[in-house]
């Protein structure tokens, strides 16, 4: 049975840390494919605070185009209204009923996942994979993981991987200050940022 994972995010911008996580997940879980899904209108973020969804889509598209096992979906970008994770997973489950489906997210999601819309449905349709995030101790992550597993009666896969010290927020702040960010993002992402004068 094919194994595919959804890797959703705002990707504002996509950076080397995202790609590092994707490669580690690909190898650790022996995945056939990772599907990057740039969020359209995430319910937890104000629309005016994020870059145009089509620009973010292109940043991801060109960042991953050389990797055969990475692909991009425009499902959320084209979707009208808010982008809820459970709807995205239902969409992929509908068109790929006979695959092992995984959903990759930062371990910080464990803190408020009980507030996610239709989380029960999501947990039934995809296996949750979490990776560590800066600012969260291993003890905290494992405690929250156990709490969520007990609540939803589902196992959660934890990827204990060394993280690159980079975040989209940090990159945006560096650009505002005029600092160099070339080593933190894919070259084609950098070119798009320069083209549109983003984050200044």
From Swiss-Prot:
What are the BP-aspect GO terms? NAD biosynthetic process
Sorted UniProt keywords: ATP-binding, NAD, Nucleotide-binding, Nucleotidyltransferase, Pyridine nucleotide biosynthesis, Transferase
Q: Which InterPro entries match?
A: Cyt_trans-like, NadD/NMNAT, Rossmann-like_a/b/a_fold
What EC class is this?
Answer: transferase
Transferase is among the record's keywords: yes
EC numbers on record: 2.7.7.18
One of this protein's Pfam families, by short name? CTP_transf_like
What pathway or pathways are given for this protein in its record? Cofactor biosynthesis; NAD(+) biosynthesis; deamido-NAD(+) from nicotinate D-ribonucleotide: step 1/1
A GO molecular function assigned to this protein is:
ATP binding
Q: Can you state which reaction this protein catalyses?
A: nicotinate beta-D-ribonucleotide + ATP + H(+) = deamido-NAD(+) + diphosphate
Query: Family, per the entry?
Result: Belongs to the NadD family.
Q: What does this protein do?
A: Catalyzes the reversible adenylation of nicotinate mononucleotide (NaMN) to nicotinic acid adenine dinucleotide (NaAD).
Could you tell me which PANTHER family the record lists for this protein? NICOTINATE-NUCLEOTIDE ADENYLYLTRANSFERASE-RELATED, PHOSPHOPANTETHEINE ADENYLYLTRANSFERASE
Q: What's this protein's name?
A: Probable nicotinate-nucleotide adenylyltransferase
**What is the organism field in this record?**
Clostridium tetani (strain Massachusetts / E88)
Q: Which gene encodes it?
A: nadD
């Amino acid at each position: 049975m094919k194994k595919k994972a959804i890797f959703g995010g705002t990707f504002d911008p996509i950076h080397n840390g995202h790609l590092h996580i994707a490669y580690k997940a690909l190898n650790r879980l022996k995945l056939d494919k990772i599907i990057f899904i740039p969020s359209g209108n995430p319910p937890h973020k104000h629309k005016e605070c994020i870059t145009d969804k089509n620009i973010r889509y292109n940043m991801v598209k060109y960042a991953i185009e050389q990797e055969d096992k990475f692909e991009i979906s425009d499902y959320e970008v084209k979707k009208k209204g808010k982008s809820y994770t459970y709807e995205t997973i239902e969409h992929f489950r509908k068109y790929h009923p006979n695959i092992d489906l995984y959903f990759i997210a930062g371990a910080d999601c464990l803190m408020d996942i009980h507030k996610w819309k239709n989380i029960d449905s999501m947990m039934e349709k995809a296996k949750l994979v979490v990776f560590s995030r800066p600012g969260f101790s291993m003890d905290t992550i494992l405690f929250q993981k156990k709490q969520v597993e007990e609540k939803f009666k589902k196992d959660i896969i934890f990827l204990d991987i060394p993280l690159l010290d980079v975040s989209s927020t940090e990159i945006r702040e560096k650009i505002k200050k005029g600092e160099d960010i070339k080593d933190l993002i894919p070259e084609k992402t950098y070119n798009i940022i320069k083209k549109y004068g983003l984050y200044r």
